[in-house]
Amino acid sequence: MRSTLRVTTVALSMITMGGCGPDSPGTLQLPNQAFPTEFPQPTGRPLQIEDYYRFQNLRGLLVSPDGAWVTYALALPVEETNGDVHEVWVVAADGSEAPKHILHNGQEVMAPAWTEDGRLRYTAGEVWSIDPADPSARPRAESVSSVSGNPSPDGFWIASLEDSPMVESSARAFSDFETRHEGRFRGVQFDWLNFQRDGAPFPAPDPTANPPREIVITRVEGGAAPEGDVTAESRKLTDLGLRPGNPVWHPESEILAFTADPNWQDERRYGRSDVWSVTVDGELTRYTDDGWNYGSPAFSPDGRFLSYTGGYGTDMIKEAALDHGGPRDLFLVSLEEGVSINLTADWDLDPSGPLWSPDSEHIYFRAEKSGGTHLFRVSTAGGSVEQITHGERSHDGIQISEDFSTIVYSLGLFETPSDVFAADLDGANERRLTDLHTAIHDEVSLSRAERLLYPSYDGTPIEGWLLYPYGYDPAAGPYPLVVHSHGGPHSASGYGFDFKHQLFAANGYFVLQTNFRSSTGYGDDFKWATWGAWGDKDGEDVMAGIDYAIAHFAIDPKRVASIGHSYGGFMTNWLIARYPDRFVAAAPGAGIVNWISDYGTADIARTKETEFFGTPWMEEAARRMIRQSPLTYADRVQAATLFIHGEVDQRVPYSEAEQMFVALKKNGVPAKVIQYEGQAHGIRGHWNSVHRMMNELRWFDAWMGPDPSGADHPGEGGTP
């Protein structure tokens, strides 16, 4: 029987104001929660690992300029190739028509995009376009400009970035003998600090060895010059010796805004950017120079303002020895007056992806909030931030049509994979446009989740979600529990479908996710609450969630496991070391165990100089790193532990897993390592994903899982 998508019950017609009351950013209320007492039994079968290849991954939402059509891409996993088949579809945004699969001469197409006149453009050998209302009509061949860059609104200029000539160094010439032996060398050599980049060959190229680049504008061939403009074919507008990001045009084609890192060649400093502008006559203006990290510059449609986002720069935090990070805000500067204001100074979440309204009166943006992503806006005249979309849900990939009539997004829940939705700009009149997994819903009963709001040990409100085991019946319990911790740590768990979690639930496990302190979407104080002590308060938040779940559901406190990847892997290692009598099994993925060894061997380890107050050779920082390292407490671990790691992980080096594995084996604790060949920090590929899930499930089943035969599992005296 098909499960019902609950999102249709959420009213979206009201725009509410942020900043006060229970709907405020960063505010969680702790109600006296009442949980269901009756649990209807599933009518479909449980999810199986073989179902993995039946789930379609939704990608690349794009709405047409007039808001009438939506194109999206599907990636269908293929077991035989370890790859995907990619499909492009188009659907009417009003929900009046079924989605249409776009093919070109029977073949799949690529790179969908919308033209200004509302045609759907795609690549199939060459570039073509079709009328979305009639995809079967003969496609029209589209010409492709050979000029790369950003055209000005008046069509007269193309703005681009041009590398400056490199100054050749004068090195001593080698003798013939030296040349022969240099040619025989097999290995790597480097003398730059940032020699690692996860997923890149080792060593990564020296980023400071790149040439400076400048902004150049080139006259479009055949372009009509503005009245009275006598100009050369090309102009170099800047001579900063920096490496600017892609410039954006002022609506009157007279100014370009861009960002650039003023310290880009200093390898000891951390990347950040300031905001600049330059006129087509080369007049330069710098808007920021305060140590913050700025981005996303955009001019208002009426040409009066420039907006940009910004947050504390890493060097700024480090040099001031701050005990917290900073906010991320949205700024507005008047081009006439040169005055900058912070539009979100009194708002406690992190705006991203800002977009101007056509009337220049509002800026729309996305932000995480309480396990979801929502659309917000703020008036350019100031005032409170307004929340547009609402509900216990996450609006992913939000797109706004060029005419600002329609928003589109993907939406999924714990028990429902993502589908495409559209709504009016104010969030009202929501339409579901796709139904991608009907066959699965008709056959498989997926487990639903319960939202938990509970106090941590010090009373701090924490949000989490508990996924029920398939066929849950309290009288048949107690059931084992798998606790999943998210990565980051400055990220969040939340609303959305997760195949692995559903697989655990289908095999008789509760699955708990918590947004512990350091998670995003709950305000700055919450986000930075673990500063200098990763694992302490956030670990308590996870443990309090376990206690809360056990108190309210039929969970066996003697059969609890921890799992997670990256920071979630660290958290797993931390929990089993600091709360050894609470866990019987664990599966940390790419988890740090030793902050000292991580410092010099990982590609971003040095950024932790902020949250650990320094480097390993500084006494206070070293003390904190040792204190917060799971390896320090390895002698306490009792949980049978499966270490998952990529062979060439440069974000959390494989040696981190080795250190903890050796410690556990030396202490007689069951442990196993699975290392994925050629894999970096994110272990990719369908074969690897399936293999990993199979082995994690086997490990948990072996040490604490339900056994239909009633026989003892290895956690009661055997080995898996």
Predicted regions and their residues:
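Active-site-proximal cap/loop segments of hydrolase catalytic domains
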Residues: 506, 513-720
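Cap/lid segment of the alpha/beta-hydrolase catalytic domain
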Residues: 318, 436-558, 565-566, 600-604
